[in-house]
Amino acid sequence: MKQLIMEMEEYASSKNVPIIEKKSIAFIMKYIKDNNVKGILEIGSAIGYSAILMASAKEDVFVTTIERDEERYMECLKNVKKCGLDKKINVVFQDALDVNLTEDLKFDLIFIDAAKGQYTRLDAPISFSSLTISTYLA
């Protein structure tokens, strides 16, 4: 998986795809381990870099990640499958503002890594039914 992560970093750099900084993902991965995080909702998948790293932080972590850009969504799916985490990462192709997660889901962590200019619009419009949230990182 280390090789895939390096390839993803190179891809992101060459295609100007924003990915999380190494210090930030290291902090999040430590948080996941230290706080027994099991369910993660990520808004803004890009190429799947952070979802893959978060899902690999612990054996029992499951990530639902949402991406609205079709090219990035396809790249994310490819990378998730390539690293063998397709059973631990659910990639959703939709705008986060239109998502309605109606299943009974429990997220211990919500990580918003979407278009930074849209953060203020993400606060209320996302509709969750029977959702428990423990931690929210933006």
Q: What are these regions, as identified by a protein language model?
A:
Residues 1-109, 116-131:
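A short alpha-helical cap/connector motif
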Residues 133-138:
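Conserved beta-strand signature within the Rossmann-like core of class I S-adenosyl-L-methionine
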